[in-house]
């Protein structure tokens, strides 16, 4: 009996190691061929104890159901990844909205270094190189017929960074928002200069300023980012006081390098 246990365990867990598909809403699925280019975007997930790189992948073709997925598998080597995209996954339940077939591929918590990527679909492969440093992820890839990277470089959020926005409904509230930003510095927040680029959660333009979201929904908005190493509860308390005093007039968001 002992001779059969390990092979049986291997057979059970092998699909879990290498096969992945979309988060579909039903187990009743059909599959169809991938017939358009796959666009790939780098994204880093932040948490208090680690940082995880993901690839967000979507077909160039737009479908009538937003919940179509992409079936794929990944084989990871010491410094390499082979990613094979198999097919578009069609659920029997359609969430009616236009969108690409998509999937999210977990690359993991990667050490600094260089990684070779092999991207395969419909029997053809394209090669790319991923360079990981403490400051960024960079992709070296010549766009081909089957794959395209939307962001060839993803800057990494520095330690102790906080950032966000203050949206407000009337220009007369500008002084209140400025007071909030000044109060952050009284609490210990220090101005920080970041190089231009895409940080995933925000972008910095060539002048070093934080770019407001394209569709932020406020008549007026101010962006901010600081180095902050003191008690985060003090910032939460400051935000709460202002938003309680100016209900439905000022909306403040705040995010941290630990994913809060």
Residue spans for each PLM region:
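Bacterial Sec-dependent N-terminal signal peptides
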Residues: 1-6, 11-39, 260
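Acidic/polar, low-complexity intrinsically disordered N-terminal segments immediately downstream
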Residues: 22-86, 141-165
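Short, cysteine-centered beta-strand-loop-beta hairpins and adjacent loop/turn segments enriched
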Residues: 63-65, 89-99
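Short acidic/polar inter-strand loop motif in beta-rich domains
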Residues: 89-94, 120-129
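Ligand-binding face of N-terminal immunoglobulin V-set domains in extracellular IgSF glycoproteins
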Residues: 98-112
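A short tyrosine-centered beta-strand micro-motif
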Residues: 110-122
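Surface-exposed beta-loop interaction hotspot
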Residues: 125-184
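A eukaryote-biased signal for long
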Residues: 173-260
